Amino acid sequence: MKICIIYHSETGNTRHVAQHIASAFDAQLVEVTDTVSYNRLTRFLVLCKMANREEKTVIEPASVDISGFDLVVFGSPVWAFKPTPVIHAAINGLKGCMSKPAVAFSTHGGRPGKTDETFKKWIEERGMVLVAITNIHQKDIENQKKTKEVVALVQASVKV
């Protein structure tokens, strides 16, 4: 089974989880980034406001063709209790995604808020099927038990 992991990471937490999943499945990693350069303060002020409004930003790569994959995994930090504008743009720019099964995870330092329902909405708007979703608090990022739970969630989704 071919798995593609598309993720956005600012502090490295989401990247760490994505890499852990990729190593367990020999999956392809695609890190999406914002093309606009922000300083630390403006990045969170501007992008958190955009996240709250469920807006998208301009990203690199602008689109990802997932037609050759059997499962796609999305990863995002939580900003303003929702996934980031970067991952929103990535989902919106997908090619070959109709009817693909998807798994989503988020990393956060507080609470996930409306992240799950927002991820679900965006994924289903693109014609994909969300088969699993989870959230990981930043204090659990290095926790082997928690990362194994995420890998097990993806493994169970592979069997769907």
Regions found by a protein language model. Give the residues of each.
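Alpha-helix N-cap/loop-to-helix initiation residues
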Residues: 10-14, 80, 111-112, 139-143
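Short, glycine-/small-residue-rich phosphate/pyrophosphate-handling segment
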Residues: 103-137
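Conserved short-loop catalytic and cofactor-binding motifs
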Residues: 2, 75-78, 107, 135-138
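N-terminal beta1-alpha1-beta2 submodule of the flavodoxin-like/Rossmannoid cofactor-binding fold
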Residues: 1-75, 81-93, 148-160
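A charged, well-structured terminal subsegment
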Residues: 129-160
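A glycine-biased structural micro-motif
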Residues: 98-100
